[in-house]
Amino acid sequence: MFVNRRYTARGKNLPSSPKKVRPIADNIRGKPYSEAVAILCSMPNKCAKLLGKVVKSAASNAMYHNRNLSEDMIFIKTVMVDDGRRRRSVWPRARGRADRLVNRSCHIFVEVYEKMYGGE
């Protein structure tokens, strides 16, 4: 029998816009955990570091719930990046005008699964 158990982790209100995180999330979707971490560590972006923390948290959750699980058995199943809260502020401009400054954040959802063969 083929056993697939799934484990999740979420990062909420992370200080980076979803537009910047989504291309990085596309690079690791469907990959083994060790390969995904290697890809994220080699990227110089701040977003890669944030995404790496959530991926490591999901893998840690998987290894906590199943002590016999090794890193080689963990695969990335789902990576979703959604809009988080927006912090709006005012940016003073010339001649008494003002522009609106919007600082975006994102929610990252990572789901990993274990690939292993088990008995009944």
UniProtKB/Swiss-Prot annotation:
It comes from the Bacteria. SUPFAM superfamilies: Ribosomal protein L22. Keywords: Ribonucleoprotein, Ribosomal protein, RNA-binding, rRNA-binding. GO terms for biological process: translation. Residues 1-20 are annotated as: Disordered. InterPro entries: Ribosomal_uL22 (IPR001063), Ribosomal_uL22_bac/chlpt-type (IPR005727), Ribosomal_uL22_bac/org-type (IPR047867), Ribosomal_uL22_CS (IPR018260), Ribosomal_uL22_sf (IPR036394). One of its GO terms (molecular function) is rRNA binding. The keyword Ribosomal protein applies. It holds the Pfam family Ribosomal_L22. One of its GO terms (cellular component) is cytosolic large ribosomal subunit. This protein binds specifically to 23S rRNA; its binding is stimulated by other ribosomal proteins, e.g. L4, L17, and L20. It is important during the early stages of 50S assembly. It makes multiple contacts with different domains of the 23S rRNA in the assembled 50S subunit and ribosome. The globular domain of the protein is located near the polypeptide exit tunnel on the outside of the subunit, while an extended beta-hairpin is found that lines the wall of the exit tunnel in the center of the 70S ribosome. Part of the 50S ribosomal subunit. Belongs to the universal ribosomal protein uL22 family. This is Large ribosomal subunit protein uL22. The lineage of its organism: Bacteria, Pseudomonadati, Spirochaetota, Spirochaetia, Spirochaetales. The gene is rplV.
